[in-house]
Design a protein with these regions (language model features):
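Short, intrinsically disordered terminal tails adjacent to the first/last structured region
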Residues: 1-2
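Class I (Rossmann-like) S-adenosyl-L-methionine-dependent methyltransferase catalytic domain
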Residues: 8-92, 99-146, 168, 173, ...
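A short acidic, Gly/Pro-enriched loop at the edge of an enzyme's catalytic core
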Residues: 147-157
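A short SAM/SAH-binding and catalytic strip from SAM-dependent methyltransferases
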Residues: 156-169
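A short glycine-rich, Lys/Arg-flanked "PGG" loop and its adjoining helix->strand segment in the class I
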Residues: 172-184
């Protein structure tokens, strides 16, 4: 009979082997979806290739891609409205970690008078955005600062499902950089994995003790870089990271599905 320790070791090996095979088969799956799927974009929007959709949502399903993007665009407006702000009143807005435009596709369509910008670490995604979202400006950023923007250029920066993946070193590097590109009084909207996510698993006591825990995802290993995996943190820990650079206005639990949101102001 297998002991508990031996069983856990065997299970890890089987899981690692399965995910290694899974990653090898992914390019074939992406090609088949692009070649034979009849998935289409909503009117007026463009459909990114399956490979890019998967890197953003871990799914090639076009309906889910657009559904999540529309829901995120709505959630941004709700969080802002709860603190008395209207998205249409902002002049220059940056999508930090825009990917292949899952959210920006909807926002630029709904708010054409806003000057939209997007930046991401993936050149292929930015290339696609430049070709398919001509109303916005796009840049490629490195894994660490700086961004290719002047000081005080934006009155709103949002980063949805970015700090859910960055390790603490990278988070602490990016927070002052996001402050730099914001105007005085500008807003930063971040999402993160809140207590309702990490409090149900083995990570709960460690997150409570340390404030933040970074986990390498078996599914994302080899697909995403080592510093961009899965991060759990307490609201107080993120508030502490922001406090030297921003005034936190609001913490909204489960504002973006399974992610919490923090809205902060550059003073």
């Amino acid at each position: 009979m297998l002991t508990h320790g031996v069983f856990k070791q065997w299970r890890r090996r089987v899981s690692a082997a399965f995910h290694a095979l899974y990653r090898k088969l992914l390019p074939i799956h992406w090609w088949l979806v692009d070649r034979f799927s009849k998935q289409v974009a909503p009117p007026g929007l463009a459909l990114p290739p399956a490979r890019l959709r998967f890197q953003v949502t871990q799914s090639t399903n076009a309906w889910l891609f657009f559904r999540f993007g529309r829901r995120t665009a709505q959630d941004i407006q709700i969080v802002l409205a709860e603190s008395g702000y209207s998205l249409g009143n902002f002049q220059n807005v940056l999508d930090f970690g825009c990917g292949c435009g899952r959210t920006l596709l909807w926002l630029q369509s709904g708010f054409p008078k806003v000057n939209w910008s997007g930046t991401d670490v993936h050149p292929e995604m930015i290339e696609w955005c430049r070709a398919n979202i001509p109303s916005a400006r796009f840049t490629i950023n490195a894994a660490l600062p700086p961004l290719e923007y002047p000081d005080s250029g934006f009155d709103l920066v949002y980063a949805v499902s970015v700090f859910t993946h960055l390790n603490e070193e990278y988070q602490r590097a990016w927070i002052p950089e996001l402050r730099r590109v914001l105007k005085p009084g500008g807003l930063l909207l971040l999402t993160f994995h809140g207590e309702h996510v990490w409090n149900v698993g083995d990570d709960a006591s460690e997150v409570e003790r340390q404030g933040i825990v970074f986990r390498t995802s078996t599914k994302l290993r080899g697909i995403m870089p080592h510093w961009y995996q899965t991060t759990f943190q307490t609201p107080s820990h993120l508030r502490g990271s922001l406090s030297a650079h921003f005034t936190v206005i609001r913490h909204s639990s489960k504002a973006f599905g399974d992610q919490d949101a923090i809205l902060a102001r550059r003073d």
